Amino acid sequence: MSRTWIRNPLAIFTANGLDAAGGLVVEDGRIVELLGAGQQPAQPCASQFDASRHVVLPGLVNTHHHFYQTLTRAWAPVVNQPLFPWLKTLYPVWARLTPEKLELATKVALAELLLSGCTTAADHHYLFPGGLEQAIDVQAGVVEELGMRAMLTRGSMSLGEKDGGLPPQQTVQEAETILADSERLIARYHQRGDGARVQIALAPCSPFSVTPEIMRASAEVAARHDVRLHTHLAETLDEEDFCLQRFGLRTVDYLDSVGWLGPRTWLAHGIHFNAEEIRRLGEAGTGICHCPSSNMRLASGICPTVELEAAGAPIGLGVDGSASNDASNMILEARQALYLQRLRYGAERITPELALGWATRGSARLLGRSDIGELAPGKQADLALFKLDELRFSGSHDPLSALLLCAADRADRVMVGGAWRVVDGAVEGLDLAALIARHRAAASALIAG
């Protein structure tokens, strides 16, 4: 692949403090050189891209999502419900999911993410009703088609209503089925090393939808194959009450009891922790995905990011949903994180750079990846470029701050592994209008039953 100079950006955020005011050089899918202001590339470049009207970021990394939920956005019966009633109302609808509907939902979620500057996305898929046993295979095909990177987690629910869990019986699976499929997916799809496009993690859904046995067994499989672990934890006080009543343990004690407290694990939400639990999470190096939009939408609470980071727990961001956000937009999620965390910690402490760092380098750490999430020689050439020429940016002065403060919501250019996947604000090779029409029809059919 020829060398390309992304030249003289309006502003650039490297996520590591390195100077790249003069741009960067891409070759063979990687960044090979950062340039200071006025510097020229060390070797000739076959092509140049004038970035003088663009703010350049590392490709954003989304560390918690449920792609299938794009089919149930803004559904009236759940608009004003908190988490547990929200789930109980939606479970029967989601149980009607089919491979065709999942493919459309996944494509919509990934296209929306890509257009928002996201190049890597983790999805937590835990629904495998009859006929949808190959759900992760469906998702892997869409990831390849759109040319993104993904951490596809093999979620699971094994604790149904009849045994004291939250989900209805038609949405749960036996432990043997879950573990066999986990092994199959790791063998078939999990790529290792720099530049991996698809990786697999194991993700029993939550304390109120899986048994301790499947948590322990999943941890053993993950350790044996050196893959990561993911689950929802400490999202609501209802969940905390469930753990106390069923297990006699608070959430972090429960996590520890099933062998999950460690650096292999990242958790979605992580809101309701006391000081001792924060200390233990930090010492273990367990990561936390902050989902500000979802947490506000469901009135769940505010993640204690500052204390968690100070204790040693990595922090990343996730859009969650898309029935609890209800968008799949990573640059807007960084804005939400900025504002929600300022509400807790004050304006001086939570800066745009901190929020963007969570959305890039921090999120990459949650996924165990050191090759993405920042701009430096040797890193993957995953880039998000935003123009500031819309009405909302008129009168802004600091380009990097303007991305979040003025609510940027769509990238002009996005590069994944050295290849442009978004050009002039459109996904390459994707008929978006046709996709929207098919997706809307599928969403209506799902609700209608």
Swiss-Prot record:
Annotated Gene Ontology cellular components are: cytosol
Quaternary structure, per UniProt, is: Homodimer.
Q: Where does substrate bind?
A: 69, 235, 269
Cofactor section = Zn(2+)
Protein name (Swiss-Prot/TrEMBL) = 8-oxoguanine deaminase
UniProt binding sites for Zn(2+): 64, 66, 232, 269, 320
Question: Which GO MF terms does the UniProt record name?
Answer: 8-oxoguanine deaminase activity; deaminase activity; metal ion binding
UniProt cross-references to NCBIfam families, sorted A to Z:
PRK08203.1
The similarity annotation says: Belongs to the metallo-dependent hydrolases superfamily. ATZ/TRZ family.
How is the cofactor bound here? Binds 1 zinc ion per subunit.
Which EC class does it fall in? hydrolase
Q: Which PANTHER family match?
A: AMIDOHYDROLASE-RELATED DOMAIN-CONTAINING PROTEIN, AMINOHYDROLASE SSNA-RELATED
- This chain's source organism reads Pseudomonas aeruginosa (strain ATCC 15692 / DSM 22644 / CIP 104116 / JCM 14847 / LMG 12228 / 1C / PRS 101 / PAO1)
| InterPro entries from the UniProt entry | Amidohydro-rel, Metal-dep_hydrolase_composite, Metal_Hydrolase, MTA/SAH_deaminase
Describe the function of this protein. Answer: Specifically deaminates 8-Oxoguanine (8-oxoG) to uric acid. 8-oxoG is formed via the oxidation of guanine within DNA by reactive oxygen species and leads, if uncorrected, to the incorporation of 8-oxoG:A mismatches and eventually to G:C to T:A transversions.
Give the metabolic or biological pathway.
Purine metabolism
Q: Which domain of life is it from?
A: Bacteria
Question: What Enzyme Commission number(s) apply to this enzyme?
Answer: 3.5.4.32
Keywords for this protein: Hydrolase, Metal-binding, Zinc
